[in-house]
């Protein structure tokens, strides 16, 4: 983009603002007619007149934009202004129109950025982000390929508005510093008239002599200057008039005709000049007599009296510099004096007055928009909260002025920081609220939509919703789809756009006759359909929603905005190294996940003026357990993350020390210790405001991390440390978020399950899903803890029940306060993309705090939803899976929704003729299973009761491949020795876990090992499993109703005693089955019967025992390596104490697999 650089005798040209043309462009300021009118500054636009009804200011702005051809992209630069009250309307303000009301509003560009045109070399240019510029960052030079801020229609409107503002003195001329400066300003104003008249002539395609006689410079200069000229003598007025005509003619001949200057160039030049000619052009200044700048530890009030006179302060908001404040300066006038001596004295006096007021007149920076987290309005008092917990409070003249002020800051925030967020609910634009609820973007361009799809994986059916850049009544849906081509092997990825039409509040897909009352309803309908276009068919899957501070063409790139762009985490580890000689280890404080916690002292040596001073700093030492040195890298990654942050509510990391085999994280010592313990101790004295302060401080820290795109990964009350109790003081509590410890990416699945419900559900499925969204889930759970005084949610649940809790998409029971419950529910959404941004969380917590809900009396959480209880009416039988003497197992679908989408489960129940003993056995089996959690043990899902609780069914996961006994013969060609040994390792791991919990299985056989996949097996059927008493090494069976004797160890057959070593014997038999592919001719029963001969009843057991005493064992299976058979034989030692262990077997098999 190129702009004109005009050099003229009139030294008045160089900046930006707003203009008018001809008599027709003058806005009628007579008393308004009844009704509501929206006035435009364009000469060819009739005012927008509204009929009876209810409208929002945003609605009217859209209508006005359509009337003036302003694009949806530039529409958010405009707002409605009431010249009578001198107030702007917030976008959500409701206007009720009836016959009695009379209101005139002006449609104006409100949000302005100086040097948007790039013609001022002394100031950084301003542009819209474009896909090309996104990677390059901010450049000091002009960017020829950057996207301009304004479109043609917006520029035209701004030009007309600028003329009006200059003439009507809405944009006041800057104050002259000297008399000569006053003359220069007058010349600049005449130069503006030259530009305006030249533009008018070019638009009308007229030569200067052809212009109407009433087109005079007087109509294009400020009314105050025009009045001043009229008061001068006739000769002076004639001289000004002749000089202006000569200059206009010369400008036309030398510049307009010779340089091929366009009307666009003249508009840009006029507006650029307006920026330097006027005072604070594009800025809004608010006056207050009460101003407070504060942080959590200090306050600075500015509302004192000066000798009985109230001191006023000014707060200025500009697009380029953000929010600034100062004392309101005294007005210093320049008096005209012909006498040179007296004039010099006056100028000296003026300089002295200027120096006196210099300090008062200087603007102090408070904040640029991306720093702001939320804004609160209470009547006429506005509180602006920053990320560093500093706050500005100012009292304005009315609630309406407060809304006007906040809507200004909120609008600039969306233009510079985050296009899809609002800072204050009181001024929330309805369209932004709609977009957030529906995951819809503003009018981002196609390139950004496609880039977003690519960044999120470009899976088929993934889509982006976005408003059209050109039409207010259309939403575009950009979808990833794949076109299969006969010419090209495989499918070609394509991005297709679909148009959604919005008419009279209803939504429909272009080309479809069916419409819906909301965008959400339409999308729900479309997701069930197969969409077709250009020989491509697909189904919609996942919507890519707006993300916090996402870069797009909706954002304006100013110098300050670029400074606040997220700095993404360093790819390399970075932290300060601490020497071991500088650390003194203190007492042991406890254990973390794979770490030991100690108090300690850090010796800090400072060289002050040649003298070395030793300072002792109290610290916490987190020592990685030397047995887990394999995860040292993950430990250092956590330290590196903490090294990148600096926030008052996050614990400070001094550095890392490597001491011999120990890796140590050295952190700030926080006096009050973990928050959960403190809340338990002080639960009786904790108040609602106290809890809200804790929640806000945590949200502030997490919002800071979100802005830096950093993930904590372990947010909970035990990781919140209390630096100040704040129960008896006005300051309140002060908390610090500690380090996350070992990242979940290196934790076992069991360790992840233990962290339910703090860990996000998607991270349980795959720890690689860890993202900022996971911290939002954790925040919701931590908010629950804070509400209930540090109570532990799901504390009585077993691991299997916790896992089921997530599988059933449950949440902890929320408090009775509806708004607080809603916030927790939104944070704990099972769709990570639906969780709110932390800025929105902070805003909502502050809004909720105003209501002061009672969250203290909720002493104990209500009963949790039990996801392990299955209702009988939703169990739909599919087929039988197996049957025994007393029970059976069925395949069922648990389908509470009634749409055949429920999960398939295995249901074990007793036959009707079974007696009370069998019911007790099934209950014992259920109790055992619900306490077991291992990847190689079949999962317990719950129970189903019937007959008033007398009947019971056991619900387990269904593994469709069946048992090894069924699976191996059918898949013999796919299963080699290596895979057989892997199965053996998995069975041993499951049995080793079972033994560690003091259980004996008593029925380990191939028929009871189930196949989850080609690569994983699980131990099932715990009907005979028994618990060994703590003071014994074995379990004695009272009966042998259905004992699998050919898998039993000798002590089981002779004495009915079952040791863990007895399961080892059974494993050896199972391994034999595994290596013979469960061939019926080679089954343990078939082979043992060949050894002992025909027999039946108790004689079978007697002969089997004698055979085993003789040292006879099952033979080596065909093609079984001797090393494997030797491991098998170690399982069959006659004495239990001589047998190998499951741990030794695991090591032996793994050595063979290497």
UniProtKB/Swiss-Prot annotation:
It comes from the Eukaryota. Residues 34-420 form the FERM domain. GO terms for molecular function: ATP binding; CCR5 chemokine receptor binding; growth hormone receptor binding; metal ion binding; non-membrane spanning protein tyrosine kinase activity; protein phosphatase binding; protein tyrosine kinase activity; ubiquitin protein ligase binding. The modification Phosphotyrosine is found at residues 3, 1034-1035. Mn(2+) was used in the in vitro kinase assay but Mg(2+) is likely to be the in vivo cofactor. Its EC number is 2.7.10.2. Keywords: Acetylation, ATP-binding, Disease variant, Kinase, Magnesium, Membrane, Metal-binding, Nucleotide-binding, Phosphoprotein, Repeat, SH2 domain, Transferase, Tyrosine-protein kinase, Ubl conjugation. It catalyses: L-tyrosyl-[protein] + ATP = O-phospho-L-tyrosyl-[protein] + ADP + H(+). It is an enzyme of class 2 (transferase). It is found in: Endomembrane system. The modification N-acetylmethionine is found at residue 1. The active site is at 1003 (proton acceptor). Residues 439-544 form the SH2 domain. Belongs to the protein kinase superfamily. Tyr protein kinase family. JAK subfamily. Tyrosine kinase of the non-receptor type, involved in the IFN-alpha/beta/gamma signal pathway. Kinase partner for the interleukin (IL)-2 receptor as well as interleukin (IL)-10 receptor. Kinase partner for the type I interferon receptor IFNAR2. In response to interferon-binding to IFNAR1-IFNAR2 heterodimer, phosphorylates and activates its binding partner IFNAR2, creating docking sites for STAT proteins. Directly phosphorylates STAT proteins but also activates STAT signaling through the transactivation of other JAK kinases associated with signaling receptors. This is Tyrosine-protein kinase JAK1. The gene is JAK1.
